[in-house]
A protein has these predicted regions:
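Aromatic-anchored, charged helix-turn/loop surface patch used as a conserved interaction hotspot
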Residues: 1-111, 156-174
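C-terminal non-catalytic interaction appendages of large macromolecular assemblies
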Residues: 96-172, 206
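Intrinsically disordered, low-complexity proline-rich tandem-repeat tracts
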Residues: 173-176, 181-186, 192, 200-202
Length: 206
């Protein structure tokens, strides 16, 4: 799903003061470099322009920037308490069996021990089994290969969250883009996701 026309939510984001825009974007992605680049590039004529800017900023994140971004994401199966965003994105694990949750915990720990960071995947639309299979597959990657997969997955997450940010701002004025607070930024399966032909993990995003 893409949008080639401007919206009220996008207009409100474009009009935010710099500090408020950075706060809103921090709820989308914890990388300061990513948020700063998107903030200074405003105004965006269309939502597609915003998504393209996000893709470009994500592509240029350094290893340190990626680490900062990943630090804002909880492990799969352990969403942040009181955070509806991570809970909604990881709802595929909510009804998983105790055995699957335990296996995912063990795989997460093994992955983190090898790579030094959480296992990051665009969880929207995935079942618990699909996420488990993905970490099983990716744990055998080299650090360099895994870093680029993480970059792709982060880009997908950012697009979904940005889509929800601007569309929720249009549907519910005053909630996600309230100046000085950063919102709450809620996510679901309705945001636009870039296609990644040949990606080692196939997505089922709406």
């Amino acid at each position: 799903v893409t949008s080639s026309t401007t919206s009220g939510g996008l207009d409100r984001f474009n009009a935010l003061q710099e500090r408020a825009a950075l706060a809103v974007l921090h709820e989308v992605c914890a990388s300061r470099a990513w948020a700063e680049r998107l903030t200074v590039a405003r105004p965006y004529p269309t939502a597609d322009d915003l998504y393209a800017a996000s893709d470009a900023a994500t592509a240029e994140l350094t290893t340190a920037d990626l680490a900062e971004a990943m630090a804002g994401h909880p492990p799969i199966g352990r969403p942040k308490p009181g955070d509806p965003t991570s809970s909604r994105e990881q709802r595929g694990m909510a009804d998983a069996s105790a055995e699957l949750k335990e296996e995912m915990l063990e795989l997460n720990l093994a992955y983190q021990e090898k790579f030094g960071h959480v296992f990051l995947i665009c969880a929207t639309g995935r079942t618990g089994e699909q996420m488990r299979d993905a970490v099983r597959e990716r744990i055998g990657n080299s650090p360099e290969r895994e870093r680029e997969i993480v970059r792709v997955e982060l880009g997908k997450i950012n697009r979904i969250r940005l889509g929800n940010l601007v569309h929720l701002a249009e549907d519910e004025p005053g909630a996600p883009l309230q100046e000085g607070t950063g919102g709450p930024v809620r996510t679901g399966s309705g945001g636009p996701v870039p296609e990644e032909p040949g990606s080692p993990v196939q997505e089922e995003e709406a």
